[in-house]
Amino acid sequence: MTSATIPGLRGSDGQAPTEHSELLAWVQEVAELTQPERVVWADGSDEEWERLTDQLVEAGTFKRLDPKKKPNSFLALSDPSDVARVESRTFICSRSEADAGPTNNWVDPAEMRATMTELYRGCMKGRTMYVVPFCMGPLGAEDPKLGVEITDSEYVVVSMRVMTRMGKAALEKMGTDRPFVKALHSVGAPLAEGQQDVPWPCNDTKYITHFPEDREIWSYGSGYGGNALLGKKCYSLRIASAMAHDEGWLAEHMLILKLISPENKAYYIAAAFPSACGKTNLAMIQPTVPGWRAETLGDDIAWMRFGKDGRLYAVNPEFGFFGVAPGTNHSSNPNAMATMEAGNTVYTNVALTDDNDVWWEGLEGEPDHLIDWKGNDWYLRETETLAAHPNSRYCTPMSQCPILAPEWDDPQGVPISAILFGGRRKTTVPLVTESFDWQHGVFMGATLSSEQTAAAEGKVGTVRRDPMAMLPFLGYHVGDYLDHWIQLGKSADATKLPKIFYVNWFRRGEDGRFLWPGFGENSRVLEWIVGRIEGSADAEETAIGNVPRAAHLDLDGLDVDPADVDEALAVKAEEWRKEIPLIEEWFEFVGDKLPSGVRDEFEALKQRLG
């Protein structure tokens, strides 16, 4: 089939839906390479959603849920081999290997393009090729960050409508020549004539490849989440971090929270935690401290740049939440539950109840019988395997969140007063520490550490360094990335920089129990952080930073022994001396590009510890 005979290449009526010549040429080039049966330009309309979801139900990919309980919502079960991000098959193909750095997989870009071009040849035979224009962040931005994903997966088109500002409006924003990120995706499962499709097509060979200088993403073989929804980690973090480095801003793996004091003053906080450390729960916190309220602007990604007034402003580039389902319930995160229960949600790899609803571990009420994520019968107290996959997901529109901040769609973003780093540590790291200054805060972020959880490859429980929680998402050298943070701080007005804090909700006593109750009670720590911003809260200067005592926190009405809180806040020199060689080992791994400012902070810490 020549490109001239591929139906839909020039739009449904033969009139090209855009005059963007670079986009039209790229669509034609990809169609000629991948040989789809037809081309469809996605418009993001309700009609398109209805058509595609009906098609997915008919194909057996989607199961329509009970419209009374979960209106306009669907369950998808993936192939058991295609369930998570694959860090081992994720590549940063910068032109020079030195620019990828020690934390990324690198292949020469020319070699990678040749390999993947052969994989893409004819890979969409028998399928529809969708052209999906989208915008990351508000469409009204001065410099909108646009993208086009070409995909052969209806699941991807439907999910991109939830997760991004997708369709006709984004295409119009591109005009005739605006730059855009090219994101090419195929499940890698061509269909021969008359061949029966499977509910979840994918390929054992997988590549998730980024060409940072060319602003291109090539993904092959996976239909799942971050491997296939290329606006998410691939664009918003890996490609955007490279853009941000070139253009003088920050693309970060952070939630954005709006905290409102009893005096009705708003404070905006960005926070970076690795997977499974409570980012979504903090983003949607219900404060337990009387008079305090919280609203959310995002639970995963923040793009931050300095405004004309010298303050750092953040926007969330996403349009939906793509959250981990297990552990989410009406007490741990009532706002997330309300968001998805409003409908228009796609669930992946959770369990199905007998009355056509969804269930996962940690959700209230254990049913006697389920269909598990592999499509098998599951019986309470009899079946030994999990009903939902540990990385099962909900994909739901942000606009449905009951505590969504009104500024969520403001292209100017919100001014950030505090940046939090944090991880999951049983020992050593106090509940909260304030950095001495910006550079010391960058050192804190550079040495962020967390015990491995089921959300990442690797042995559960081992401590892994995860700089700014960006380890799997850096689009360039980690040393250059840390230096970018240092330089941005140096060029800013120090009095207007956000204060930087490090939190650890997960410290345990010698008997193994958690010393701090977490969840909504974390608002007591946030209240102290606001007090430090305002200069009204006390702290003790320690070797690692400024740390409160239990008496400095508002513990009214909290059923926790103040001695436990003091233990959660304790800075123990002997534990920190054990940390020193671990940090040294990490800095050796980063190599020659470790910024001198970060090294200076490390030397100063060693001296303070004596």
Swiss-Prot record:
It catalyses: oxaloacetate + GTP = phosphoenolpyruvate + GDP + CO2. It is found in: Cytoplasm. CDD domains: PEPCK_GTP. One of its GO terms (cellular component) is cytosol. Keywords: Cytoplasm, Decarboxylase, Gluconeogenesis, GTP-binding, Lyase, Manganese, Metal-binding, Nucleotide-binding. Pathway: Carbohydrate biosynthesis; gluconeogenesis. GO terms for molecular function: GTP binding; manganese ion binding; phosphoenolpyruvate carboxykinase (GTP) activity. Substrate binds at residues 85, 224-226, 275, 391-393. Catalyzes the conversion of oxaloacetate (OAA) to phosphoenolpyruvate (PEP), the rate-limiting step in the metabolic pathway that produces glucose from lactate and other precursors derived from the citric acid cycle. Belongs to the phosphoenolpyruvate carboxykinase [GTP] family. This is Phosphoenolpyruvate carboxykinase [GTP]. The gene is pckG.
